[in-house]
Amino acid sequence: MAAALLARARGPLRRALGVRDWRRLHTVYQSVELPETHQMLRQTCRDFAEKELVPIAAQLDREHLFPTAQVKKMGELGLLAMDVPEELSGAGLDYLAYSIALEEISRACASTGVIMSVNNSLYLGPILKFGSAQQKQQWITPFTNGDKIGCFALSEPGNGSDAGAASTTAREEGDSWVLNGTKAWITNSWEASATVVFASTDRSRQNKGISAFLVPMPTPGLTLGKKEDKLGIRASSTANLIFEDCRIPKENLLGEPGMGFKIAMQTLDMGRIGIASQALGIAQASLDCAVKYAENRNAFGAPLTKLQNIQFKLADMALALESARLLTWRAAMLKDNKKPFTKESAMAKLAASEAATAISHQAIQILGGMGYVTEMPAERYYRDARITEIYEGTSEIQRLVIAGHLLRSYRS
């Protein structure tokens, strides 16, 4: 089986994984240490990120530059369609592998990390799970190699966390659906060649009247708003999608009418593992920066790392990071084992995003004045971390999800 797997493998990423069939199911927490194949994957992604992303990350951030060439190379490695089956031109790997790879990319450049996350989790994810065979061929295969990327249009100007309150509408007209409304905060919007859009097809049914659609970009009736000038993740584009009598074929309905809310929620469960992994990368980069600086900066006749106060800070940073990483891996492995993971993905996203914010904050504190200037990357990590507590469900939403599952478990 392993030989056949490798014979079908494509690209340097798969060749780096060795001879074991690494799609074996994992027993959650059977070992704190990663399987050898996943360790090799981590090193491959780290080498790529250090060569291709670290040298340009500050420039991408400063000039709001989309990393076109690097995204293409990531597609060639298989990083843009990691759990998509090989028959659809994906890498055919598992979600633990995806989490590990995304952390390494985000450690080098969080903007590139979210570009990767959106294409894998939010765009390809729902089509892979709910799409027809024809839709998978049309809307997945061309988006695996870096030539094209997709986006995900759920949030609206008047409802971000309240995903069931969509004001965008879709009505049937002959052989078409006609979309009207505005979607907000759409990542990858300016570079995307397609989007998954959620719109109300029956307002009387509230969230049970929401449906999902596949929309090519550009297309008549769809215009892009201005690129948002953001605090962080500045190399990824964020803009509104404005639908004005946007007509798409009837066969572009994803799933069945009224399934949109279910599709969105299950997609966000997957996406939260991605954002947790992005946050882990930011947190790890912040800790690396703080330790390196503290080791080389002398105060009172000794390196900062000799000061107990600095040691305590570093210990707390490492504790938060490792705890969040284990929660994230657990959520990924539950998904790989086809077990429920909604609560666990919310826990992972909450823990990792808050860890990234706290660790990047403390990194600046350790660097002092040097942490506040662009000469060092600590300030970029701090800016990039903040969004991880907001998008794909705020920290408050994650706590509601966790509490809901917790209370139901006590009542059952």
Swiss-Prot record:
Biological process per Gene Ontology, one example term: fatty acid beta-oxidation using acyl-CoA dehydrogenase
Pfam families, alphabetized: Acyl-CoA_dh_1, Acyl-CoA_dh_M, Acyl-CoA_dh_N
InterPro entries according to UniProt: Acyl-CoA_DH_CS, Acyl-CoA_Oxase/DH_mid-dom, Acyl-CoA_Oxase/DH_mid-dom_sf, AcylCo_DH-like_C, AcylCo_DH/oxidase_C, AcylCoA_DH/ox_N, AcylCoA_DH/ox_N_sf, AcylCoA_DH/oxidase_NM_dom_sf
Cofactor comment text: Binds 1 FAD per subunit.
Superkingdom classification of source: Eukaryota
GO terms under cellular component: mitochondrial matrix; mitochondrion
Cofactor(s) it depends on: FAD
Catalytic activity: a short-chain 2,3-saturated fatty acyl-CoA + oxidized [electron-transfer flavoprotein] + H(+) = a short-chain (2E)-enoyl-CoA + reduced [electron-transfer flavoprotein]; butanoyl-CoA + oxidized [electron-transfer flavoprotein] + H(+) = (2E)-butenoyl-CoA + reduced [electron-transfer flavoprotein]; pentanoyl-CoA + oxidized [electron-transfer flavoprotein] + H(+) = (2E)-pentenoyl-CoA + reduced [electron-transfer flavoprotein]; hexanoyl-CoA + oxidized [electron-transfer flavoprotein] + H(+) = (2E)-hexenoyl-CoA + reduced [electron-transfer flavoprotein]
Active-site residues (renumbered): E392
Cell location: Mitochondrion matrix
Binding residue positions for substrate: S161, D269, M270, G271, R272, G393
Keyword terms of this UniProt record: Acetylation, FAD, Fatty acid metabolism, Flavoprotein, Lipid metabolism, Mitochondrion, Oxidoreductase, Phosphoprotein, Transit peptide
EC number(s) from the headed UniProt entry: 1.3.8.1
Pathway the protein contributes to: Lipid metabolism; mitochondrial fatty acid beta-oxidation
Quaternary structure and partners: Homotetramer.
UniProt record similarity statement: Belongs to the acyl-CoA dehydrogenase family.
Protein name from the UniProt record: Short-chain specific acyl-CoA dehydrogenase, mitochondrial
Gene: Acads
